[in-house]
């Protein structure tokens, strides 16, 4: 067992991540940044490399996804082996990554969020986003709930201050756009 997950659980997790990568490649997503480089971090939001590299400002949102999935799934199924809720979390995150890279959501991001030139994620970035979610999931299992909540709030405030965007604003702007928020974000 590693991190409270059995060998079987890790194999299931790896298979789900591999399936996500295969689906994204089948959808025509670029394996890596079309610019031809692979970077550990890319910090410029309004850039053709945003959502193309291993990590970026939105990696914090994926860690928060892991916090949320852990809390909800352990509450729903407290007696299940940890790999079961982890597999469900990976499947859910993977489904979002697939949807996020569909023309419907790419166009929606361009219309109503600060991601004016967004063209979707590279496969590398989507897989990395999923692995950041896994890290958040596993971290939440080792922290008290209030520490996890405080860290999520800190991540939200930090990214809001730094790039004028975060998970909360991203969801709000996708679901019910507010022109004043879009204007404020564009001013940053």
Swiss-Prot record:
Taxonomically, the superkingdom here is Bacteria
Query: Cellular location of this protein?
Result: Cell membrane
Positions of transmembrane segments: 8-28, 57-77, 143-163
Q: Which UniProt keywords apply?
A: Cell membrane, Membrane, Transmembrane, Transmembrane helix
Give the chief site where it resides.
membrane
What membrane topology does this protein have? Answer: Multi-pass membrane protein
Q: Please report the name of this protein according to its UniProt entry.
A: UPF0314 protein Sala_3154
């Amino acid at each position: 067992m590693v991190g409270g997950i059995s060998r079987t659980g890790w194999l299931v997790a790896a298979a789900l991540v591999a399936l996500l990568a295969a689906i994204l490649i089948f959808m025509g997503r670029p394996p890596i940044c079309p610019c031809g480089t692979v970077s550990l971090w890319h910090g410029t939001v309004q850039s053709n490399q945003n959502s193309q590299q291993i990590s970026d400002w939105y990696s914090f949102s994926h860690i928060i996804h892991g916090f949320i999935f852990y809390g909800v799934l352990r509450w729903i199924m407290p007696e299940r082996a940890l790999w079961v809720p982890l597999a469900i979390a990976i499947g859910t995150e993977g489904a979002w990554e697939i949807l996020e890279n569909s023309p419907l959501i790419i166009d929606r991001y361009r219309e109503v969020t600060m991601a004016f030139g967004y063209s979707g994620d590279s496969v590398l970035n989507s897989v990395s986003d999923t692995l950041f979610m896994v890290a958040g999931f596993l971290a939440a299992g080792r922290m008290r709930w209030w520490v996890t909540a405080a860290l999520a709030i800190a991540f939200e405030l930090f990214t809001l201050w730094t790039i004028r965007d975060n998970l909360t604003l991203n969801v709000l702007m996708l679901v019910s756009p507010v022109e004043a928020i879009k204007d404020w974000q564009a001013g940053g």
